[in-house]
Every structure is written in C-alpha cells, then in structure tokens.
From Swiss-Prot:
Outer membrane channel, which is required for the function of several efflux systems. Required to export RtxA cytotoxin. GO terms for biological process: response to antibiotic. It is a multi-pass membrane protein. Keywords: Antibiotic resistance, Cell outer membrane, Membrane, Signal, Transmembrane, Transmembrane beta strand, Transport, Virulence. Disruption phenotype: Increased sensitivity to bile salts and other detergents, erythromycin and novobiocin, but not to chloramphenicol, nalidixic acid, or tetracycline. Highly attenuated in mouse in vivo growth competition assays. This is Outer membrane protein TolC. GO terms for cellular component: cell outer membrane; efflux pump complex. It comes from Vibrio cholerae serotype O1 (strain ATCC 39315 / El Tor Inaba N16961). The lineage of its organism: Bacteria, Pseudomonadati, Pseudomonadota, Gammaproteobacteria, Vibrionales. The keyword Hydrolase does not apply. It is found in: Cell outer membrane. Homotrimer. Part of tripartite efflux systems, which are composed of an inner membrane transporter, a periplasmic membrane fusion protein, and an outer membrane component, TolC. The complexes form a large protein conduit and can translocate molecules across both the inner and outer membranes. GO terms for molecular function: efflux transmembrane transporter activity; porin activity. Belongs to the outer membrane factor (OMF) (TC 1.B.17) family.
C-alpha cells in the first residue's frame, strides 16, 4: 500500500529486535490483535453476518422432510386393537418467492458491511494502541521534565538559603524558591499518577501489564508536510474510507428492505410433492384384518395475498422511512470524513511549524536561563527571575515533546480518515523507536 507521507526520515530504519526489547509498539499491537475485546466482538459479528448468508440461501433450496410413526389404538367399546405403521418423505421447492431472493441479496450486503466494519475496527485498534502507547511516553516525558525541574529548583533553593545565611539574599527569596519547589513536588505527584493511569489505559486494550516501553528516537525523528491537497485527500477518502463504505452499504440494505416489504403484495409459487406409506392392522376376537396404502403426490401451488389488513403497506412505509434515515446517516458520515481529513491535514501542517518553533523555544529558554542565573550571581536579576526562567525551560521541553507525539498521531489519524491506515504504518512508527536508557 502506498504511503501518504513518511513518518521518519532516516538513511536506515531498523525495527527493534524483540530479543533486546519486547515492549515496543509493534509487539503491543500484536498483543492487542489477540486480546482486544472490541476487535474480537466485531470479528464474531462479522462471522455471524457471513453465516446469515448461508441461512438466507437455504430458503431457495429444496426442503425435504422424512416422517415415520407407529401408533397403537385400543378401544373400551370393543375388544379390538389397531396398529398403524406410517412413513413418508415430502419435499417443497420454491419456484417463485420474491422475498427469498431479496433476503439473500440483503444478507450478502450485510456481510460486506460487517466485513467493512471489522476492517474499520482494525484500523481503529491501530489508532487506539498508538494513542495509548504515546500517552505513556508523553506522561513519561512529563515526569522526567518535572523531576529535572525539581532538581534544578532544589539546587536554587539550597543556593538561596546559603546566600541568605551570609546576607546576600533576602528571606523573601528563600520563600519564593521554597514555594516553587513545593509546587514542583505537587506536579511530580500528579505526573506519577498520570503515568500510572496511562499504563492502565494500555493494559485495558491488551490485558497485559507493562512497566517500560521503547521511546521515541528524537535524533532520528523528522516531520514532513503532506504532498497532496485536502481536496485530493478527500477524493481518496470517498473511495477508501471504511466507515463511509459501511454507511453506503447500510443505505443499500435499507433500499432492499423496501423491496422486501413490498414483496408481500406478490404471489408465490411452490412445487410440492411426496410419498407416504401406511399399514393399518385391526385385531379383534373374530378376525384379524389390515390394509396397506401407498400415496404419491406432486403439484404446483400458487398463493396470492389479496388482503393483509394493511400490514404490507405499513411495512413498506416503515422501510421507506428507514431508507431516508440511512441516507441521512450516509450524508452525516461523508461530512464527518471531510471534516476529519481537512482537520488532520491542517494539524499535520500546523505541527510542522509548531515543532520548529518549540525547538527554537527550547534553545532560547536554555540561553535565557543561563543569562538569568549569571545576572542573579552579580545581583542584576532576582531569584524570581531565575525560577521563572527555569519553569519556562521545562515548559518548552514539554511542549516540544507533546508536539512530536501530536504530529505522529495526526498522521495516523489522517491515514485512518483516508482509509489507508495499515499494519505497515505500525512498523514504520515502530522503526522510529529506540531502547530506553536505564
């Protein structure tokens, strides 16, 4: 499948060896395919829909029944006993029954719809796993930044206390540093909780516990703009989006249901036949007698519905209203796809600019912190200035980290909206991960 745009640009992208690191995106996705309840449920529904085709086709085939019986009759009015042995085979074959053909066609379309929904759920699983995975990495990065900020503010607090003891700083500087340090401690508690919850969200999908994941290789990470316009992408989505395809089939099924309901006005023709054998014996005090019979029959039966109390007309109207509803659902699905394609395409292009800006913001914030610390040492800047500069540096790092993950997810979301999201995309993203440092 042709890729929409590269996620990572590198001379050589090798997938992570499972012998070195098992808990990467590809491994977790494979676990999700085997254990995700949503996917397994939709798979079972798809199998049921295909089995319904066989059930609908059976109505067009001969219906053959074998019967047999042995009955003993006794009477109190006369000292006699009669035994009846019977057997028979009968068949019925529809020659014309419009509803049976429509039902078969509808069942086949529902099977295709279920297959499309299953494929859409597979794509949804890729996106759900990717979102949950990168939420863990996002929370992990945030915790690392908070802990780094805590260490930096802690050093500044100790330096401020020392300066206060020798008379170089006011007590208010100590209080300001202590206040920010306490705030960072609270942020650390929240960040740890967020990481725990993000791991739990990943466990919900696969049923497996995780403690450490492969991380994004930021040195090899590169973002690129989409090469096609939103209108060109929308055109592709019209043909390939799986949810849109399922909505179209749903409209077709609703149209067939009108035909199915109106077929109640049409006659039906069946070929019926059979063979029956019977042996009836009577036993009384005077004599023993019996009779045997063999019956053969075959014929064509016509059934014409003349009046059903208005039921057929009512069912037809219900089906017509349902068709209108399905048509509106299709229009809503189309508009949603158009919105998603444009939004995700815009998000990708916006992320490119944001990534560049955040990269520069990190450089600028680092330089600003160094300059502010130097100014504080010579008395031209206050501890509040240093603390603010420290916070800006770690905020810039967090924003840059978030922007990378947002870009990757936007690319995957766009591919899902177009209908091209596949397992190859999982492998492409997985190739941009690396073993985390201990």
């Amino acid at each position: 499948m042709k890729k929409l745009l590269p996620l990572f640009v590198s001379a050589a992208l090798g997938t992570l060896s499972s012998a070195v690191w098992a808990e990467n995106l590809a491994e977790i996705y494979n676990q999700a395919k085997e254990n995700d309840p949503q996917l397994l449920s939709v798979a079972a529904q798809r199998d049921a829909a295909f089995e319904a085709v066989t059930s609908s086709r059976s109505a067009l085939l001969p219906q053959i029944n074998l019967t047999a019986g042995y009955n003993i009759n006794r009477s109190d009015q006369a000292p006699r006993e009669s035994d009846l042995l019977s057997a028979g085979i009968n068949f019925s074959q529809e020659l014309y029954q419009r509803s049976s053909w429509v039902s078969l066609d509808t069942a086949e379309k529902k099977a295709r719809q279920a297959d499309s929904q299953y494929a859409a759920t597979q794509q949804g699983l890729i996106l759900r796993v990717a979102k949950a995975y990168f939420e863990v990495l996002r929370a992990q990065d945030n915790l690392e930044f908070v802990r780094a900020e805590k260490a930096a503010v802690g050093r500044q607090l100790e330096q401020t206390k020392q300066r206060f003891e020798v008379g170089l700083s006011a007590i208010t500087d100590v209080h300001d540093a202590q206040a920010q340090f306490d705030g960072v401690l609270a942020d650390e508690v929240l960040a740890e909780n967020s990481l725990t919850n993000s791991y739990e969200a990943l466990r919900e999908i696969t049923g497996q516990e995780y403690s450490k994941l492969a991380v994004l290789d930021t040195k090899r990470f590169a973002a690129s703009r989409t090469t096609e316009s939103s209108e060109a992408l929308i055109e592709k989505a019209q043909q390939q989006n799986l949810s849109l395809l399922a909505a179209r089939i749903s409209q077709d099924v609703a149209r067939d249901n009108i035909s199915l309901a109106s077929s109640g006005h049409l006659p039906s023709l069946t070929l019926d036949g059979g063979y029956n054998y019977g042996n009836n014996s009577n036993d009384n005090a005077k004599n023993t007698s019996g009779e045997e019979y063999n019956d053969f029959k075959i014929g064509v039966n016509l059934k014409v519905p003349l009046y059903t109390g208005g039921n057929t007309t009512s069912l037809t109207k219900q089906a017509e209203f349902a068709y209108v509803a399905a048509s509106q659902d299709l229009e809503a699905a189309y508009r949603s796809v158009v919105k998603d394609v444009r939004a995700y395409n815009n998000n990708i292009n916006a992320s490119i600019g944001a990534l560049r800006a955040y990269e520069q913001a990190v450089i600028s914030a680092k330089s600003a912190l160094e300059a502010t610390e130097a100014g504080f040492d010579v008395g031209t800047r206050t501890i509040v200035d240093v603390l603010d500069a420290t916070r800006r540096l770690y905020d810039a790092n967090k924003n840059l980290s978030n922007a990378r993950y947002d870009y990757i997810l936007s690319v995957l979301q766009l591919r899902q909206a177009i209908g091209t999201l596949s397992e190859q995309d999982v492998m492409d993203v997985n190739a941009g991960l690396k073993v985390a440092k201990k």
